């Protein structure tokens, strides 16, 4: 049993270590500065109550992006120095964000221990590599992201930090081999356990879904399937789940080897960045080679996001969560007793609202950030939730879950097709169009303007807030842009009063609400590593069955024109077009 000592290292604060909705994200070149990561980790330990650190069990893993291995060694040595009792590390340092949440909630160590929290090393859908992004966030004992009370405290600590604790002579741990290594420090034993990254998560998925039913679908000669991990951590789970457990062909998996630079790509599952999958599903500019699969899906870097595609058909994330909620009780055993409630982020379309009303379910509209859903789930108020940024999940964990969403869709397809496996399969497009026929359609798009000058972005938002004091002026501008648009009846900055803990979250996005249910929403995103990202959300509700089959960009064109004119987007940003359209 190796001995280690503890050193106190003098340090000074770094500017800008304020965690956003998903932790601290910066360029790798920022994180590799001496003391930078250490300051943030010590500030996090100092923000936690003593019982969550001293004698505690912590998970440390991530999506495998560049600098993860070095960060795991640093955090492990700091945990030992701060009195943590054990560290759990996924093999090769890999754990998807949803798997971390599952491990915190479900896993019991060989000595009966349970994790009280986790450092997750990810920048989610942001690129990886020496010149790209790195990130770190802390998750609590419920498996969810640290609430604002903790993240604010972490930030305050980063502004005053004078020293951090580290065990410099603790040997680097071999994260490639499963097993336990024991050490002894000034406060007693310290153990590091490297464990199988996938087994706990797979066990949880098998308790939620009818794997046999999905297996029948995936092994049917009439059904074809394609899953793209975009070289993110989902690759560590894809073969084990889709091939070994569910019988899919191995060649149905693409880009499923995790890479520290995500193969040089952008691990963001959308129509812009998941190019290979989009082409294979018949949604690219040229005709695909070979037969187009019935079902396709993609994940982001840390596997908490998902994109669902049918044959030549894109399912919007807003529709996806509504369709899962509408079919969950019948198609997914975990929900057979009924849903406790549903929730969506404010910018997500109101498709879920209509389902909730139809099924008489509790409904909540929350700010962007999964922690708000977590509060509702912990209080037993929410079963299924989602956000327009390709995040979908349920109360099985406290993070969004990309593979869970794919299994939910496969469950719905299996349920709808169960008596027709030998004849005509129900397609993804069939399910979506039937949903629109029942509930109406929410035409929806999102324009992202990335790496905009931060000052210009703030000026644009201030302009939009000022306009809200005069709705007649707003309507005059909109009518000047397009006569085919309804009247704005309300404008505000979204504010959320949490029904569970009473906390108030202000300035969560600028909203313009129209008489016919249409919405324009403008937000500054906190997930980028530099510059500002302006997100513009455009939504129009259509109940007329004769009008629900239009192309989305055609149906929304008048509202898009109105939004660009109202915001003076080009004037403020110098951009004549968005970086990404979803």
Swiss-Prot record:
Name its cellular compartments: Cytoplasm
Q: How does it assemble?
A: Monomer.
What Gene Ontology terms for biological process does this UniProt record contain? glucose metabolic process
Report the EC code(s) recorded for this entry. Answer: 5.4.2.2
User: Which key words are in the record?
Assistant: Carbohydrate metabolism, Cytoplasm, Glucose metabolism, Isomerase, Magnesium, Metal-binding, Phosphoprotein
What protein am I looking at? Phosphoglucomutase, cytoplasmic
Active-site feature positions = 124 (phosphoserine intermediate)
Which positions does UniProt annotate for Mg(2+) binding?
Answer: 124, 300, 302, 304
What does the cofactor section's free text say about binding?
Binds 1 Mg(2+) ion per subunit.
Gene3D superfamilies per the record?
Alpha-D-Glucose-1,6-Bisphosphate, subunit A, domain 3, Alpha-D-phosphohexomutase, C-terminal domain
Q: Which reaction does it catalyse?
A: alpha-D-glucose 1-phosphate = alpha-D-glucose 6-phosphate; O-phospho-L-seryl-[protein] + alpha-D-glucose 1-phosphate = alpha-D-glucose 1,6-bisphosphate + L-seryl-[protein]; alpha-D-glucose 1,6-bisphosphate + L-seryl-[protein] = O-phospho-L-seryl-[protein] + alpha-D-glucose 6-phosphate
What residues bear Phosphoserine in this entry?
A: 124
Under the heading PROSITE patterns, the entry gives: PGM_PMM
Positions of alpha-D-glucose 1,6-bisphosphate binding: 25, 124, 304-305, 368, 387, 389, 400
Q: Look up the record and report any one GO term of the cellular component aspect.
A: cytosol
Q: Which family does it belong to?
A: Belongs to the phosphohexose mutase family.
Q: Which PANTHER family match?
A: PHOSPHOGLUCOMUTASE (PTHR22573:SF2), PHOSPHOHEXOMUTASE FAMILY MEMBER (PTHR22573)
Query: What does the record give as cofactor?
Result: Mg(2+)
Note one Pfam family from the annotation: PGM1_C_vert_fung
- CDD domains attached here? PGM1
Q: Which GO terms describe its molecular function?
A: magnesium ion binding; phosphoglucomutase activity
For this protein, the record's InterPro entries field holds: A-D-PHexomutase_a/b/a-I (IPR005844), A-D-PHexomutase_a/b/a-I/II/III (IPR016055), A-D-PHexomutase_a/b/a-II (IPR005845), A-D-PHexomutase_a/b/a-III (IPR005846), A-D-PHexomutase_C_sf (IPR036900), A-D-PHexomutase_CS (IPR016066), Alpha-D-phosphohexomutase_SF (IPR005841), PGM (IPR045244)
Organism the protein comes from: Pisum sativum (Garden pea)
Q: What does this protein do?
A: Catalyzes the reversible isomerization of alpha-D-glucose 1-phosphate to alpha-D-glucose 6-phosphate. The mechanism proceeds via the intermediate compound alpha-D-glucose 1,6-bisphosphate. This enzyme participates in both the breakdown and synthesis of glucose.
């Amino acid at each position: 049993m190796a001995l280690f000592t503890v050193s106190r290292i003098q340090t000074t604060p770094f500017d800008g270590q304020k965690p956003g909705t998903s932790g601290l994200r910066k360029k790798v070149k920022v994180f590799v500065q001496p003391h930078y990561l250490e300051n943030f980790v010590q500030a996090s330990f100092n923000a936690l109550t003593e019982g969550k650190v001293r004698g505690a069990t912590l998970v440390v893993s991530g999506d495998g992006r560049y600098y993860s291995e070095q960060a795991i060694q640093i955090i492990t040595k700091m945990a030992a120095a701060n009195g943590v009792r054990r560290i759990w590390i996924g093999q090769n340092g890999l754990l998807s964000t949803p798997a971390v949440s599952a491990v915190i909630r479900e896993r019991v160590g060989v000595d009966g221990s349970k994790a009280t929290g986790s450092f997750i090393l990810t920048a989610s859908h942001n690129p990886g590599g020496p010149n790209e992004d790195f990130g770190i966030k802390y998750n609590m004992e419920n498996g969810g992201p640290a609430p604002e009370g903790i993240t604010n405290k972490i930030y305050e600590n980063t502004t005053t930090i004078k020293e951090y604790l580290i065990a410099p002579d603790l040997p680097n741990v071999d994260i490639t081999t499963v097993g336990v290594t024991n050490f002894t420090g000034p406060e007693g034993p310290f153990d590091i356990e490297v464990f199988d990254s996938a087994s706990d998560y797979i066990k949880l998925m098998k308790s939620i879904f009818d794997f046999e039913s999905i297996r029948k679908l995936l092994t049917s000669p009439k059904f074809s399937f394609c899953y793209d991990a975009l070289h993110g951590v989902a690759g560590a789970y894809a073969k084990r789940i889709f091939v070994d457990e569910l019988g899919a062909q191995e060649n149905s998996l693409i880009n499923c080897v995790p890479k520290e630079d995500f193969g040089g790509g952008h691990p963001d599952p959308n129509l812009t960045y998941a190019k290979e999958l989009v082409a294979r599903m018949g949604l690219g500019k040229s005709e695909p080679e070979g037969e187009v699969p019935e079902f396709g899906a993609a994940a982001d870097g840390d596997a908490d996001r998902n994109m669902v595609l049918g044959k030549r058909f894109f399912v919007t994330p807003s529709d996806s969560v509504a369709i899962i909620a509408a079919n969950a009780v019948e198609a997914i055993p975990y929900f057979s007793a009924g849903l406790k409630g549903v929730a969506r982020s404010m910018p997500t379309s109101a498709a879920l609202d209509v389902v909730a009303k139809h099924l008489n379910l509790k409904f909540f509209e929350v700010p962007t950030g999964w922690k708000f859903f977590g509060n509702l789930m912990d209080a037993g108020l929410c079963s299924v939730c989602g956000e327009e940024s390709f995040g979908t999940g349920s109360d099985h964990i406290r993070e969004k879950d990309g593979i869970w969403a794919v299994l939910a869709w496969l469950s719905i397809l299996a349920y709808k097709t169960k008596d027709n496996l030998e004849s005509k399969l129900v397609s993804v497009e069939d399910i979506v169009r039937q949903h629109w026929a029942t509930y109406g359609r929410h035409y929806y798009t999102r324009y992202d303007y990335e790496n905009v000058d931060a000052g210009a972005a703030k000026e644009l938002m201030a302009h939009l807030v000022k306009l809200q004091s005069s709705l007649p002026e707003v309507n005059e501008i909109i009518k000047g842009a397009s006569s085919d648009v309804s009247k704005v009846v309300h404008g505000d900055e979204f504010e959320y009063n949490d029904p569970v803990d009473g906390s108030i979250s202000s300035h969560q996005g600028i909203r313009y609400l129209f008489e016919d249910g249409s919405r324009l929403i403008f937000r500054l995103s906190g997930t980028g590593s530099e510059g500002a990202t302006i997100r513009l959300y455009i939504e129009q509700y259509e109940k007329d069955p004769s009008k629900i089959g239009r192309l989305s960009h055609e149906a929304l064109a008048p509202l898009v024109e109105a939004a660009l004119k109202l915001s003076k987007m080009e004037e403020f940003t110098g951009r004549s077009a968005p970086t990404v359209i979803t």
